[in-house]
Amino acid sequence: GKVVDKKAEYIDVRKYPKTVKVVEEMARFYNDSPTLRRILASADTPFEAREVLGCMMCDAFMEVTGAEIGIVNPGGVRIESHPQGDITVRDVLEMDPFDNHAVVLELTGNEIVHMMLTYCHNTLHSFPYVGGITCEITLEEDFPEKIKCIKLLTLDGKKLNMKKKYKVVTNNYIPATSEIPEGSDHILNLETSDIIMQFLEKKKVVSYQGVSRQKIRPLE
């Protein structure tokens, strides 16, 4: 047949009057599960921004896989903040709910830049969070959300060797939505949420208050 008309509307499920008791009970049972309430670590200070959580995730990816550089897309961090105090299994699954797998890549500095810029389409809003390095970002003068160029630096502020190859770890979403050299990626049999849990259980206490690995440079 032929579609002659169509209509769609948004429904605010939080205000939707109808409920299904069976579904409500299933959700309550799931949310009250001791498995989800298990404490992994304690946040010594609050995580006050999505980037701060992303930096912690990058560090977790690096520590568990032995990679030199960690990268996480902003959309891969699904909560905006987390208070000081306990971090539970449920918190991690809310932070990273996608069943993503870790991917290790062997990339030069230039290839890392190309991967990140093709992923975010040169926009600051979607620029990934990082671990093991910092990023100096210069924006276009006429389009302040558009990235003109980025410089990768080591954690002690030295310029990264852009021709050297580095072991990079990310989730499977970034390589699937960016440009990378053929055959440079290797998917691990490790879910990223499990990696974060391993990291937190090992650390016991974490503090990332004020951590940022992106610096916006003024136009010269």
What are these regions (language model features)?
Residues 1-220:
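Catalytic centers of hydrolytic enzymes
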